[in-house]
Amino acid sequence: AIILLAVYRPNLLKITPNQWKIVIPSGLSLGAMNLIFYLAIERIPIGLAVTLEFIGPLVVAVIGSKRLIDYLWVLLAAIGIVLIAPWSNNGIDLLGVLFALLAGALWAAYIVLGTKVSKIMKGGDAVATGMLFASILIVPFGILENGLTNLTPTFLYLGIALALLSSAIPFTLEMKALAQLPARTFSILMSVEPAAASIFAFIFLQEYLTFNEILAVVFVVIASVGSTIT
């Protein structure tokens, strides 16, 4: 939030009541989504958490669909999600699953609200203001968890890098995308996330892809490309 506010410098005094009514819930849904997702990956594998979370955007895609061809891309994305999820793990933490599904519901809310915000506010202003309210929601939990004991130079450097790579840059780009794309198309394009999570897990964590996981990557890529060209 600090980085985005410094870069875009939104004039909070000029934000209208109608804009506040949308940007505040958008920011809160964003903050809650991130907080609950991290609670999920404390309990279940990242690939499963991302897969379950994507059910939210997938629901948005289905609800916003009006053509038969749209359901084909949603179906392909759904098949990819099912294939990529480690359903064979019998020791899955049910609370972790619940957290991931709740994060998905909040993600769906963020997509819908973000689409509305992008139509009435500049992208940078919307992201910076929304992230401000997201931080207002999340920071108290961090303070209650460990106080200020973790505020070492190394921790702060890593925190800044994480803030840029996981929030500031991605959500700025997402807001620009939401301004140009229907919520349905945006939701299907986001289906690359489960595939990306598995690929990065393979690269950085040496988690090898099975045949089903490779097939899942193919399905979600086809769904993403198909949704943009039809």
Label each PLM-derived region with a short phrase:
Residues 49-52, 113-135, 167-203:
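Helix-helix packing/entry segments at the starts of transmembrane helices
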Residues 1-25, 66-71, 89-91, 95, ...:
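Membrane-interface interhelical linkers
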Residues 25-28, 32-36, 78-79, 89-116, ...:
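Glycine-/small-residue-enriched transmembrane alpha-helix faces in small-molecule transporters
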Residues 38-68, 103, 184-202:
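Specific alpha-helical transmembrane segments that line the substrate/conduction pathway
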Residues 155, 191-230:
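C-terminal-most transmembrane helix of multi-pass membrane proteins
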Residues 27, 31-35, 58, 108, ...:
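Hydrophobic/small/kink-forming positions within alpha-helical transmembrane segments
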Residues 40, 45, 64-67, 117, ...:
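Hydrophobic/aromatic residues within transmembrane alpha-helices
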